[in-house]
């Protein structure tokens, strides 16, 4: 439980080791924010109840890495050297993530729309994954993690 001005809850996630990524803190505190801003991007959360929403999304890190691994392995099975496959996939997703950060003041649906052309490859990928329920599964997983944290 966050107690104003006495206990500040902070959860620096593993990418902090490379001085990247968010550090949610609860409740907001100028000194703690100043400290964590030196090693990441501090996100100030008003109360403990709201903070659980952020902690829930941090439970998706392994799923993200698994997606990178699956795509990299798919390239390897298609004859690409493992090192080249991993470099391509990780570089692609780094660029996409950096683009998302640069455009983070815009609604993310803008990036979804701008990254596809009608009947193009990205349109096909998005529609196939939508029809297979991939994004609903992501929401269900987040809800499951949230429920666990709320107990």
What are these language model-derived features?
Residues 30, 90, 94-151:
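NAD(P)-dependent Rossmann-like dehydrogenase/reductase catalytic/cofactor-binding core
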Residues 1-3:
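Short, small-residue-biased leader/transition segments that mark boundaries at the very start
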Residues 5-6, 21-55, 59-105, 144-149:
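Internal alpha-helical scaffold of NAD(P)-dependent oxidoreductase catalytic cores
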Residues 16-17:
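Conserved catalytic-site region of short-chain dehydrogenase/reductase
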């Amino acid at each position: 439980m966050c107690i104003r001005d006495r206990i500040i809850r902070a959860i620096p996630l593993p990418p902090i080791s490379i001085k990247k990524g968010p550090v949610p803190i609860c409740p907001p505190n100028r000194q703690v924010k100043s400290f964590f801003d030196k090693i990441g991007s501090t996100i100030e959360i008003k109360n403990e109840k709201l903070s659980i929403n952020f902690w829930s999304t941090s439970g998706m890190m392994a799923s993200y890495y698994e997606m990178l691994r699956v795509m990299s392995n798919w390239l390897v099975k298609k004859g690409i050297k493992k090192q080249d496959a991993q470099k391509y996939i990780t570089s692609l997703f780094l660029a996409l993530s950096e683009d998302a950060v640069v455009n983070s003041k815009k609604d993310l649906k803008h990036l979804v729309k701008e990254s596809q052309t009608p009947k193009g490859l990205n349109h096909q990928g998005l529609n196939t994954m939508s029809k297979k329920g991939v994004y609903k599964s992501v929401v269900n997983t987040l809800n499951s993690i949230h429920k666990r944290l709320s107990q």
